[in-house]
Design a protein with these regions (language model features):
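Residue-level signal for inorganic ion chemistry
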Residues: 4, 57, 112, 118, ...
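Well-ordered beta-strand positions
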Residues: 84, 113-114
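Non-catalytic interfacial helical region
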Residues: 71, 92-101, 109, 115-117, ...
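Nucleotide-state-sensitive switch-loop elements of NTP-binding domains
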Residues: 1-98
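Short acidic, glycine/serine/threonine-rich loops at helix termini
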Residues: 68, 99, 156-160
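Charged, alpha-helix-enriched surfaces in structured cytosolic catalytic cores
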Residues: 29, 33-40, 59-62, 66, ...
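C-terminal accessory "lid"/substrate-recognition subdomains
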Residues: 107, 111, 122-183
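Short, ordered loop/turn segments at secondary-structure junctions
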Residues: 3-5, 120, 149
Length: 183
């Protein structure tokens, strides 16, 4: 499901040519004006395709926290489970974006469960480390992927996206076991 704030979708044609089923929601944001359309689109995808995974690309103008709430609200009515919120950050512009976009960018970073750094293939180790440190200040728990685009596989991205859920499940299991032992 792709959400473009403008009236014309940018990526839809390319994705369709690649054989990816896409449902476009244009001229608004799924976290506010298009939430009803989003619910219908998500329900259609679930019922028609029965997918293992749905990728939702929101518009670039909504806060990730608002988008997350919209997705959670829709998910309450469907048999879907939220697993990951991914954002991409340009290794060369993290500092500038934090300064120029403030709350909007901070919200994007702080609510992501996985942050993929882009443009790392030409960045120095120092530049990457500095970007990671700035991101960690805003989000100490997110998985941060620094692998260069040309070396990054879809499998690696999926693993990074699911790491936190696996860790959370492991912690819950450990807590349950500890409670059983003390009962």
């Amino acid at each position: 499901i792709e959400n473009e704030f403008g009236e014309i979708g940018i990526d839809g044609g390319f994705l369709k040519e690649s054989g990816i089923q896409i449902n476009e929601l244009n001229a608004g944001c799924i976290c506010c004006s298009l939430v009803g359309d989003f619910r219908a689109a998500l329900q259609q995808v679930v019922e028609q395709y029965h997918p293992d995974r749905i990728v939702i690309e929101p518009s670039g103008v909504g806060k990730l926290s608002d988008v997350t709430r919209a997705v959670e609200g829709v998910a309450e009515h469907l048999d879907v489970q939220l697993s990951s919120f991914v954002t991409v950050a340009d290794v060369n512009k993290v500092k500038m974006y934090m300064k120029n976009f403030g709350e909007f960018y901070d919200d994007q970073i702080s609510h992501a469960s996985c942050i993929i750094l882009s443009r790392t293939q030409n960045a120095t180790e120092e530049k990457i480390a500095a970007a990671v440190a700035m991101l960690r200040e805003k989000n100490p728990t997110a998985t941060i992927v620094t692998t260069a685009w040309d070396a990054l596989t879809g499998e690696q991205i999926l693993k990074a996206m699911s790491t936190k859920d696996d860790f959370k499940a492991e912690l819950i299991a450990m807590a349950a076991k500890a409670n059983e032992e003390h009962a």
